[in-house]
């Protein structure tokens, strides 16, 4: 009987020799190194060239991998034409926070020192610097004899004493059609009571423009009311040395941050602001530093740098002063004038100017901003001064000192996309490595698989020869026994040799009644 030998069973088929594998391998040069010839100069040169190419390949691949993990990015700039564009939100603030005529005796009692109108003894600090008319009014309001102060609220004070858009707005047109003060939404900033045109809030649709150029945007004429400016006898955060308005052009998805991002418009000039919408797309870490997650805030739904800053400043003041400024969101109590002077203003100034670690606001991954180009002309001209003075029932001097015109429009009806892209992606890395492998050693991914497959067969065979596989196979054979093939059984059939045995060698019928008469051994084996 022919059985499989133990060597074949436990060790498997012996792998081909290294020479045979090299001759059939797709790796260039391997057949010349491991040839059947005796060691020669030719084989040594081939081995040297192969090792040199392999070393260069490893150096190049290492450099490519290191470059990939630097996570470089490039910036793509493109301009896209559009049939229409959403007009931006325009927020404007008078640089004077409170109208002098609206400051009551109770306001002066509580906030006079904050506004630098009174000293800590409730006295006018420097009467020589005051205008006679203003001084007379102020002296009357500052007489607190037998005065009983009433409750005071900073939010109510800002709302009541701030400049009213209905008094400031002399003319308004959007795309040639008349607009009014009703199209402006009240918003509080660090400049006090401000107004936003085209806010897109309170159910109002966002206005769109179909053309570029002047006359196709917002044109307003404003009276800044310098006669209502508070007299300046000292330097505080609530007093202003300038006259005019502060303007910020921004997306409807972000709150105004006008004290940091606004630009000034002076009276006596018509200011033209040519805009271009810019859509910026930044990459998240590790290619960039943008914030790809939603904002974790109780005050704002969408993330933006301005929303992050306002949220952070609010938390900072609540933690340090136990109150919030009027322009800050939340439900914490408003700061009193004393808290404004002693804590809130100094704390916020410190946070904005010096503390670079508390408020770290990352760039959002998608951002819309508006590039601006400003130009201006003098207004009124000598020819129009008398007409405007008559039209608004003011003097020519008042017109020159208080009237301004602001014209905001898109330069052209397109938008600019500024997009960060990965400079080197995984596909490029694999392509470079594959190209270098083909150039230096003529290999591919399948070639590498060939090498691993051959190495696996060799290692497996050697481990089995050491006896590990033999012990396992012996345990298996003890359980299963020896397997015989059908041919083996036929060749060793015991019945063949017993055919034709003597007839007398039979069993009695009563022993095996259902069996035919057979030979003694034939019956048991067959």
UniProtKB/Swiss-Prot annotation:
Family to which the UniProt record says this protein belongs: Belongs to the amiloride-sensitive sodium channel (TC 1.A.6) family. ASIC1 subfamily.
Gene3D superfamilies per UniProt: acid-sensing ion channel 1 domain, Acid-sensing ion channel domain, YojJ-like
Site positions (Involved in proton-dependent gating): 355
Protein's name in the database: Acid-sensing ion channel 1
Description of how the protein assembles with itself and partners: Homotrimer. Heterotrimer; with other ASIC proteins producing channel with different properties. Interacts with PICK1; regulates ASIC1 clustering in membranes. Interacts with STOM; alters heterotrimeric ASIC channels activity.
Regulation of its activity: Inhibited by the diuretic drug amiloride.
Subcellular location: Cell membrane; Postsynaptic cell membrane; Cell projection, Dendrite
Lineage: Eukaryota, Metazoa, Chordata, Craniata, Vertebrata
